[in-house]
UniProtKB/Swiss-Prot annotation:
Interacts with mib. The keyword Transmembrane applies. Residues 179-223 form the DSL domain. Disulfide bonds join C181-C190, C194-C206, C214-C223, C228-C239, C232-C245, C259-C270, C265-C276, C278-C287, C294-C306, C300-C316, C318-C327, C334-C345, C339-C354, C356-C365, C372-C383, C377-C393, C395-C404, C411-C422, C416-C431, C433-C442, C449-C460, C454-C469, C471-C480, C487-C498, C492-C507, C509-C518. Changing C270Y: In dla(dx2); excess numbers of early-specified neurons, reduced numbers of floorplate and hypochord cells, excess numbers of notochord cells. This is Delta-like protein A. Keywords: Angiogenesis, Calcium, Developmental protein, Differentiation, Disulfide bond, EGF-like domain, Glycoprotein, Membrane, Neurogenesis, Notch signaling pathway, Repeat, Signal, Transmembrane, Transmembrane helix, Ubl conjugation. SMART domains: DSL (SM00051), EGF (SM00181), EGF_CA (SM00179). The keyword Transmembrane helix applies. InterPro entries: DSL (IPR001774), EGF-like_Ca-bd_dom (IPR001881), EGF-like_CS (IPR013032), EGF-like_dom (IPR000742), EGF-type_Asp/Asn_hydroxyl_site (IPR000152), EGF_Ca-bd_CS (IPR018097), Growth_fac_rcpt_cys_sf (IPR009030), Notch_Cell-Fate_Det (IPR051022). Residues 1-20 form the signal peptide.
């Protein structure tokens, strides 16, 4: 037991030491399991019964795998130092082990990862167990064990599988296994780590055993050093990537093998950076002083002799026929045209030669073999004999040459200026001047303003350099031909855009500015809205007050309408049967006037105790009535002892009341016939004849009165609604009074309302009493 514990501790220590530098996987592939009888290791049926000749037990088989360090006598007891696992139920009795299960709970081969160097040996224990159910996979119960298979082997790292077959009792298990390194791990124990990379930490790939293989252009242990350009100076050059050669400070060149001289050094060399070692013949700090100019530069040309005269100076001794500081100029003896009379000159070394035309001879062809007798002069030239022999011609104006054979071209010297055209004359020339210039050679500016060059009303002024136009406002240019841009002086402010339209400018303002030149800052919209709020509130208040006033007016109109409606309703109620008492009135009545107060036919008269106008309305003939007006001879009678009663005639009666009045008139005529008159003094009776006479008299008088009161009738129309019932009553009373006319005081009794009209003959008074 102590030995086993020691081995276990040793294995754990070994794994801890190797874990950080190695990695691999032990793979176990279960292939086939056979349990022909379907019994457990104790030979009992997996379901608890004994096996018989005609019945086979069913063993739901799963496996427990334990991988340990090498043990001569491997024990299935934990711990499993290299790893272990329990599979789900893979089949019953004899079956082929699948690669996977549908639910993904099992993968074949079984992988057990290593974090340490593979030792090369192992112990493998595989137990086949029976499960009562697929969920119950406990391994502690020994009665569930079907068989136990133990293997101790030596195993090298590789991709090849090792096959194995174990037979225990009535069971048989076929399986295979191998140990492979993880990615980037190599070697016999997967202890060599190598991961290919191409970055600042290295540029390499890995070999079969994990060795580093540098990429092209790289070197070093981890391939971090680039290989520079071949030939690059290892001391004075370096490279950051393969194939280049960068020089260190003080060196230059393709291979960084040249030192840099001192700045400004002209004719010197260096052995180390920043030196200036002068070459032979040069001196000074920068080796710029030539101590042997003739040797270094050879400045003298054309065979001249050079002599050094000091630092950077020399003198050339020229050969004949050459001149200049370096004898670079060849002297041409023909430059002065030494040959005369048309002879041609040939330049020779340090001399010249003239080739004379026929008839001439001499070094410069100055002698002629002809005489004046030969007439050699042309174009009117005068011939004269030369005392030395020969002749000479005196040419007229405009001709030249030995024989006056050449016509002089006066325009050959281009005497005309300012683009004038030159015309050659016999003895002179003529310049045709362009506009604006005068003079023989067209060199003077003429009167240019005479050509009116200034346009658009400009004023022309002559000047020394030509004319000048003073332009009117709106135009510019030399001739005032260009209109001035209105936008030229940028009249628009605050970033606005200027546009020209119809000889004026328009400014397109940016947002927030206004005015002709966009010079005004417009108020912010939010502040403007805020400033509008009080005026909105005031306007809302005024509108609310107006609505309230209108509402009050509507209410007042409605109330007044209801009051008038109620008044009409009360009058209708009175007309339907209510009796009111009319106070005794004292009136000055005249029998010749149809003045009476009637209470017959329509409704009782109210006691209103105030002056009131009585009017009677009569419509057209279709209503069988006519308008009438009554007026007393004296002051009108008043109710309640009031001394005036006015009678007015309506000229317009509403159609809705016409029917009522017509009915009242009919009732009046019927009632008056039934009135019985009694004399208060002598008890005389009214006759029908007297009543008719009285009615005729009244009718004529009413007609006259109607015409005189026509203007007053309009005023009575406005009061028709308030006095319509009183007017009808007056009409009825008048008719009744006429019917009851008598010489003596008489009384009229209204049989319907039991009213009595008393008329006094002496005072012409009418007293009306109503019995209540």
């Amino acid at each position: 037991m102590g030995r086993h514990l020691l081995l276990l501790l040793f294995s754990i220590l070994y794994m801890l030491l190797c874990q950080a530098s190695s990695s691999g996987v032990f793979e176990l592939k279960l292939q086939e399991f056979l349990n022909k009888k379907g019994v457990q290791g104790n030979k009992n049926c997996c379901k608890g019964g004994l096996t018989t000749s005609y019945q086979q037990c069913e063993c739901k088989t799963f496996f427990r795998i334990c991988l340990k360090h090498y043990q001569p006598n491997a024990s299935p007891e934990p711990p499993c130092t290299y790893g272990g696992t329990v599979t789900p139920v893979l089949g019953s009795n004899s079956f082929q082990v699948p690669d996977t299960l549908p639910d993904g709970s099992f993968t074949n081969p079984i992988r057990m990862n290593f974090g340490f160097t593979w030792p090369g040996t192992f112990s493998l224990i595989i137990e086949a167990l029976h499960a009562d159910s697929k969920e119950d996979l406990t391994t502690e119960n020994p009665e569930r064990i079907i068989s136990t298979m133990t293997t101790q082997r030596h195993l090298t790292v590789g991709e090849d599988w090792s096959q194995d077959l174990h037979s225990v009792g009535r069971t048989e298990l076929k399986y295979s296994y191998r140990f492979v390194c993880d990615e980037h791990y190599y070697g016999e124990g997967c202890s060599v780590f190598c991961r290919p990379r191409d970055d600042a930490f290295g540029h390499f790939t890995c070999g079969e055993r994990g060795e580093i293989i540098c990429d092209a252009g790289w070197k070093g242990q981890y391939c971090t050093e680039p290989i520079c350009l071949p030939g690059c100076d290892e001391e004075h050059g370096f490279c950051e990537k393969p194939g280049e050669c960068k020089c260190r400070v003080g060196f230059k060149g393709r291979y960084c093998d040249e030192c840099i001289r001192y700045p400004g050094c002209l004719h010197g060399t260096c052995q180390q950076p920043w030196q200036c070692n002068c070459q032979e013949g040069w001196g000074g700090l920068f080796c710029n002083q030539d101590l042997n100019y003739c040797t270094h530069h050879k400045p003298c040309l054309n065979g001249a002799t050079c002599s050094n005269t000091g630092q950077g100076s020399y003198t050339c001794s020229c050969r004949p026929g050459f001149s200049g500081a370096s004898c670079e100029i060849e002297v041409n003896e023909c430059t002065g045209n030494p040959c005369r009379n048309g002879g041609s000159c040939t330049d020779m070394e340090n001399t010249y030669s003239c080739t004379c035309p026929p008839g001439f001879y001499g070094k410069n062809c100055e002698l002629s073999a002809m005489t004046c007798a030969d007439g050699p002069c042309f174009n009117g030239g005068r011939c004269a004999d030369n005392p030395d022999g020969g002749y000479f011609c005196q040419c007229p104006t405009g001709y030249a040459g030995f024989n006056c054979e050449k016509k002089i071209d006066h325009c050959s010297s281009s005497p005309c200026s300012n683009g004038a055209r030159c015309v050659d004359l016999v003895n002179s020339y003529l310049c045709q001047c362009p506009d604006g210039f005068t003079g023989m050679n067209c060199d003077r500016a003429g009167d240019e303003c005479s050509m009116y060059p200034c346009q658009n009303g400009g004023t022309c002024q002559e000047g020394a350099s030509g004319y000048m136009c003073t332009c009117p406002p709106g135009y510019t240019g030399r001739n005032c031909s260009s209109p001035v841009s209105r936008c030229q002086h940028n009249p628009c402010h605050n970033g606005a855009t200027c546009h020209e339209r119809n000889n004026r400018y328009v400014c397109a303002c940016v947002s927030g500015y206004g005015g002709r030149n966009c010079q005004f800052l417009l108020p912010d919209r939010a502040s403007q809205i805020a400033s509008d709020v009080p005026w909105t509130a005031v306007g809302s208040g005024v509108l609310l007050v107006l609505l309230l006033v209108v509402a009050c007016a509507v209410v007042v109109v409605c109330v007044r309408s209801k009051v008038q409606q109620r008044r009409r309703d009360r009058e209708d109620e009175v007309a339907n049967g209510e009796n009111e008492t009319i106070n005794n009135l004292t009136n000055n009545c005249h029998r010749d006037k149809d003045l009476a107060v009637s209470v017959v036919g329509v409704a009782p008269v109210k006691n209103i105790n105030k002056k009131i106008d009585f009017s009677s309305d009569h419509d057209d003939l279709s209503l069988t009535t006519e308008k009438r007006s009554y007026k007393t001879r004296h002051a009108p009678a008043d109710y309640n002892l009031v001394h005036e009663v006015k009678f007015e005639v309506k000229h317009e009666v509403k159609l809705e009341h016409a029917g009522k009045e017509t009915t009242m008139a009919n009732e009046l005529s019927d009632s008056c016939e039934d009135i019985k008159c009694q004399s208060l003094q002598d008890s005389s009776e009214c006759t029908e004849e007297k009543r008719r006479k009285r009615l005729k008299s009244d009718a004529s008088e009413k007609s006259k009165y109607s015409e005189s009161r026509y203007s007053e009738s309009k005023y009575s129309e406005s009061k028709y609604s308030e006095s319509k019932y009183s007017d009808v009553s007056l009409y009825s009373e008048s008719a009744c009074a006429s019917a009851c006319a008598s010489a003596s005081t008489s009384a009229c009794v209204d049989t319907k309302y039991k009213s009595v009209m008393v008329m006094s003959e002496e005072k012409d008074e009418c007293v009306i009493a109503t019995e209540v």
